[in-house]
């Protein structure tokens, strides 16, 4: 790894504890998790106890009040160990900020401590069978009926969807208003009418549960609306840059790990009486 000055000694101490935790609690089991299609639920509560979830959440809501670099450390160590099934970052760095930034005080106190502890696993339901990167095209609707919103629609390719206890649902509260008709809602998994479809098989990241979600006349209190009705698209645009950053951090860490594993292999693998790393063509390829 290229030496960096970005992280303090405290960050590096945290890194050591994260790596130790993952090597004990995740690495030995990841192969089995890939077969079953999701990680064991107890890993979440153990990670919460270890301070690895939502470390940036303020202390008043149960977090450590730490900076984003602590999240970056967790993402990097997961990537370097090849633990592609662990969806901590989506939970901590994507879902939690929506609640922190746009949720009422009541919602923050109700949910954030449970996210920090790992009692609740979270997901965000944006993608639909007919709407992916075009979030203005979502068809899921939320209609106000008295003191409740009634949600109908379906979502797909939802990371953490199978284990999720709480989901942020992107829905249209005014289908005719375009981007200004989109809103965000918190929906608990045991809400009547909310069901989970099959876990989707993927080419890679097989231990990361990815599911379909269905909403049929799902009623949620209007207090579960995040922020203002119709402002959901703006909130998504505000928060998505951090999501992209977490993907970049994880991708770079995984690439560094892949290079390191390749170097180790080429030094150990012998051909024609010497390590294949000593062959000129191998060196050219590794240099590239």
For each feature predicted by the language model, list its residue ranges.
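A short core secondary-structure module
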Residues: 147-148, 152-197
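Amphipathic, small/basic residue-rich leader segments at the start of a protein or domain
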Residues: 1-89, 109-110, 114-117, 121, ...
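Short Gly/Pro-enriched turn/cap motifs at secondary-structure boundaries
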Residues: 88, 115, 130-133, 157-160, ...
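N-terminal glycine-rich flavin-associated loop
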Residues: 86-106, 132
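A short, Trp-centered hydrophobic/proline-enriched beta-strand micro-motif
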Residues: 118-126, 170
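Structural signature of FAD isoalloxazine-binding scaffolds in flavoprotein oxidoreductases
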Residues: 65-77, 134-138, 188, 214, ...
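Glycine-rich beta->alpha junctions and the first turn(s) of the following alpha-helix
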Residues: 3-10, 14, 194-288
């Amino acid at each position: 790894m290229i030496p960096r000055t970005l992280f303090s000694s405290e960050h590096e101490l945290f890194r050591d504890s994260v790596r130790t935790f993952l090597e004990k609690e995740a690495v030995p089991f990841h192969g089995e998790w890939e077969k079953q299609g999701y990680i064991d639920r107890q890993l979440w509560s153990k990670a919460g106890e270890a301070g690895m979830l939502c470390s940036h959440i303020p202390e008043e809501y149960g977090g450590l009040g730490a900076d984003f670099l602590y999240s970056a450390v967790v993402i990097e160590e997961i990537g370097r160990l090849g633990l592609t099934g662990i969806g901590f970052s989506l939970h901590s760095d994507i879902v939690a900020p929506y609640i922190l930034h746009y949720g009422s005080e009541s919602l923050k106190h109700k949910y954030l401590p449970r996210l920090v502890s790992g009692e609740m696993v979270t997901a965000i339901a944006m993608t639909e069978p007919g709407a992916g990167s075009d979030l203005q095209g979502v068809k899921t609707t939320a209609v106000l009926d008295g003191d409740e919103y009634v949600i109908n629609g379906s979502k797909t390719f939802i990371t953490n969807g199978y284990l999720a206890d709480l989901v942020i649902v992107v829905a249209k509260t005014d289908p005719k208003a375009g981007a200004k008709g989109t809103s965000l809602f918190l929906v608990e998994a045991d809400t009547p009418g909310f069901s989970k479809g099959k876990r989707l098989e993927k080419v890679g990241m097989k231990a990361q549960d990815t599911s379909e979600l269905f909403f049929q006349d799902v009623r949620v209190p209007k207090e579960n609306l995040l922020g203002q009705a119709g402002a959901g698209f703006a909130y998504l645009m505000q928060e998505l840059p951090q999501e992209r950053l977490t993907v970049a951090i994880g991708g770079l860490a995984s690439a560094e790990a892949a290079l390191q594993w390749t170097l180790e292999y080429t030094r150990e693998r012998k051909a024609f009486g010497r390590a294949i790393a000593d062959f000129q063509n191998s060196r050219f390829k590794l240099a590239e």
